[in-house]
């Protein structure tokens, strides 16, 4: 069964960025109960991706954290996992009781999904990020417009640091996604504590 989200942080994986063991890194992250984990490892053959899902899913279930697949084959998932789709593949749906999310890059896309059964949207990239070198960030105004156009909760992605969390939440986002920082840090628990602290102070400004 997929449990209800509590925190606002979504962990997006990038196993190749981990200096140490990927699963030890994930165990530390899962101990902090993020809203969900999105397994984004599109470079893997499907057989290897499936093996990774089967190894990570029990860890997520033990922690009570939903696992979402975003692998090499659009719409592919396993029982017990959600699925993340691009806007182009939005009609694939899937994810069973864990549902599916859709990535959007324009307010018009969010508006087009108002009648969709998608559980949530991911909007980005909001701030400059090494993952999108040379591509201009869309900014907080873009995020506000997406949140206003959407029916579903919106999660921001791209260059999210603890210090930027208040701006993201005040723009209307339900939460935010973090990838590289969580994969590269030697102390994920300490980093996530900083993110959670900013969640608590977001509306005190």
Model-derived features with residue positions:
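Short, glycine/charged-rich "phosphate-handling" switch motifs in NTP-dependent
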Residues: 174
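Conserved N-terminal beta1-alpha1 strand-loop-helix module at the mouth
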Residues: 1-84, 89-120, 135, 145, ...
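A short acidic, helix-capping loop that chelates divalent metal ions and anchors anionic groups
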Residues: 127-133
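Flexible, gly/ser-rich surface segments that form the specificity/activation loops bordering the active-site cleft
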Residues: 124
């Amino acid at each position: 069964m997929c449990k209800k989200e509590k925190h606002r942080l979504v962990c997006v994986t990038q196993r190749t960025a981990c200096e140490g063991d990927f699963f030890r890194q994930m165990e530390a992250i899962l101990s902090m109960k993020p809203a969900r984990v999105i397994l984004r490892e599109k470079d893997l053959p499907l057989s290897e991706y499936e093996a990774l899902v089967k190894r990570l899913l029990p860890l997520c279930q033990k922690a009570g954290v939903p696992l979402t697949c975003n692998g090499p084959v659009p719409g592919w998932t396993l029982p017990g996992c959600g699925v993340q789709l691009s806007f182009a593949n939005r009609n694939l749906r899937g994810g069973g009781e864990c549902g599916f999310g859709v990535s959007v890059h324009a307010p018009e896309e969010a508006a087009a999904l108002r009648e969709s059964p998608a559980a949530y949207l991911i909007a980005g990239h909001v701030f400059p990020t090494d993952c999108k070198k040379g591509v201009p960030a869309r900014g907080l105004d873009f995020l506000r417009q997406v949140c206003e156009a959407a029916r579903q909760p919106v999660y921001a992605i791209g260059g999210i640091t603890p210090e930027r969390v208040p701006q993201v939440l005040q723009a209307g986002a339900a939460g935010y996604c973090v990838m590289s920082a969580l994969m590269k840090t030697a102390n994920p628990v300490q980093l996530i504590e900083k993110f959670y602290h900013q969640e608590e102070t977001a509306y005190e400004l």
